[in-house]
């Protein structure tokens, strides 16, 4: 929690106003933020200065792992995070590639599980990484990326947290995740949960020990309609100790994640928080 609050204070005190064309709003912005999560000791980075709805964050990333491209599939997992971008984004609604209600296009998990090659074949990036790590192989290119400029016009949103690099040192697995842009009051709440959980899951299904997860953010910002709540409410609160994340030990393979895993297979223990804060969301 300390590093999260320090970033929020840094944005409030040092940030500069930048106009955002997509949303039509200004953002108080800083460049470069580095966060670190201790997955080995299960220090789950769940925000405590407001209530954090962690299940939706894990559900969303599980949808990426499965390569989902439809908001309805995400809702079935337990998260509505893609409803707005799939159905209320004006540019996407006017895009001829959109295939109807709830369609997200070729974003996030689609790129991770079915990156198109010029010959029409696809690459399953995640499968390659899992196969290598299970064999104890780290070719210094165990990289999962959702960032495909050649297909930005085929999706409703460019990826914000776009690339995940796994590093194997002995039998300990580490993760470095890269994010081009972060809505800190809303998005970071999700993203840090996802980075932590992704490493924990990958270590579990490849038979490795989880180490540390490193989270690198380029553009960290607070929207102008979020600033008052962050400065005058959330930053006035004292944080509670971090909880722990329990994952069903029966999850042993990528196929398990693709087929039967639900939010019932995850549990947070020892979570205390302050009251919720309803931050505005910018589509």
From Swiss-Prot:
Entry binding sites for (6R)-5,10-methylene-5,6,7,8-tetrahydrofolate: 183, 282
Annotated Gene3D superfamilies: Thymidylate synthase/dCMP hydroxymethylase domain (3.30.572.10)
Binding site for dUMP: 22, 180-183, 191, 221-223
A cellular component annotation (GO) from this entry: cytosol
Entry EC number(s): 2.1.1.45
InterPro entries the UniProt entry points to: Thymidate_synth/dCMP_Mease (IPR045097), Thymidate_synth/dCMP_Mease_dom (IPR023451), Thymidate_synth/dCMP_Mease_sf (IPR036926), Thymidylate_synthase (IPR000398), Thymidylate_synthase_AS (IPR020940)
Catalytic activity: dUMP + (6R)-5,10-methylene-5,6,7,8-tetrahydrofolate = 7,8-dihydrofolate + dTMP
Entry's Gene Ontology BP terms: dTMP biosynthetic process; dTTP biosynthetic process; methylation
Cellular compartment(s): Cytoplasm
GO molecular function: thymidylate synthase activity
Assigned keywords, A-Z: Cytoplasm, Methyltransferase, Nucleotide biosynthesis, Transferase
Primary site of residence: cytoplasm
Catalytic-site annotation from UniProt: 160
A family per Pfam: Thymidylat_synt
Pathway annotation from the record: Pyrimidine metabolism; dTTP biosynthesis
PANTHER family membership: THYMIDYLATE SYNTHASE, THYMIDYLATE SYNTHASE 1
Role this protein plays: Catalyzes the reductive methylation of 2'-deoxyuridine-5'-monophosphate (dUMP) to 2'-deoxythymidine-5'-monophosphate (dTMP) while utilizing 5,10-methylenetetrahydrofolate (mTHF) as the methyl donor and reductant in the reaction, yielding dihydrofolate (DHF) as a by-product. This enzymatic reaction provides an intracellular de novo source of dTMP, an essential precursor for DNA biosynthesis.
Family membership: Belongs to the thymidylate synthase family. Bacterial-type ThyA subfamily.
Subunit structure: Homodimer.
Descriptive protein name: Thymidylate synthase
Species of the source: Haemophilus influenzae (strain PittGG)
Lineage: Bacteria, Pseudomonadati, Pseudomonadota, Gammaproteobacteria, Pasteurellales
Gene: thyA
